[in-house]
């Protein structure tokens, strides 16, 4: 089903290949989403959210907005990204199209006709990129997000990276290449935020829980 307004094709990666899931577009008043007919006929098809069921007809705009809004950064991270894209913080369609390799839900958003696997690979980090992230998180984290086109949900300044165990090198994921680590930086008035998280995770390990 074609959507009104600009259209993005939604893919999911399964068993080493990309499957077309549906379409994201815009109407005069809201973000829109529908599952593709081919995906509905797929025996392995699953809804991308309980709030967006496969068998439904027209999906409620409020549910569509809530789901896709939840895939995007929040707070100061979104403000900085929106400014760099010269768009509104509320323009979900534009933000998704710019940060189109969503990492949490295994979804990829591409313009119709664009290969979802195009540009997949890794780019080496600069020698001082970690120092820049720690010293200037507000400036560096959005820059890295634009560079890798990963959409990391939440309000913290964070960067999705890949560690190559064979070479010991840190890399930026490109295209739909997966990240192996999410690196966070302190932001604003919470200067010890990441230290607090590290202490909590270390405590969890000491108590017998599995934690990274």
PLM regions and their residue ranges:
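Phosphate/dinucleotide-binding and metal-coordinating scaffold of catalytic cores
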Residues: 1-212
């Amino acid at each position: 089903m074609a959507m009104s307004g600009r259209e993005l094709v939604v893919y999911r990666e399964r068993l080493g290949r990309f499957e077309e899931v549906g379409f994201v577009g815009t109407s005069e008043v809201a973000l829109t989403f529908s599952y593709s007919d081919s995906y509905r006929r797929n025996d392995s098809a699953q809804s991308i959210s309980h709030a967006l069921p496969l068998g439904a007809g027209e999906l409620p705009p409020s549910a569509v907005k809530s789901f896709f809004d939840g895939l995007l950064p929040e707070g100061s991270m979104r403000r900085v990204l929106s400014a760099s894209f010269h768009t509104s913080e509320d323009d979900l369609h534009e933000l998704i199209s710019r940060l189109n390799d969503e990492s949490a839900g295994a979804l990829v958003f591409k313009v119709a006709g664009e290969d979802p696997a195009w540009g997949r690979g890794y780019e080496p980090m600069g020698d001082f990129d970690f120092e820049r992230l720690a010293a200037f998180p507000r400036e560096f984290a959005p820059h890295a997000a634009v560079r890798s086109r990963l959409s990391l949900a939440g309000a913290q300044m964070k960067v999705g990276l890949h560690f190559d165990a064979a070479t010991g090198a840190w890399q930026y994921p490109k295209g739909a290449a997966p990240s192996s680590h999410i690196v966070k930086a302190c932001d604003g008035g919470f200067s010890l935020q990441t230290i607090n998280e590290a202490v909590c995770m270390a405590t969890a390990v000491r108590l017998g829980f599995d934690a990274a």
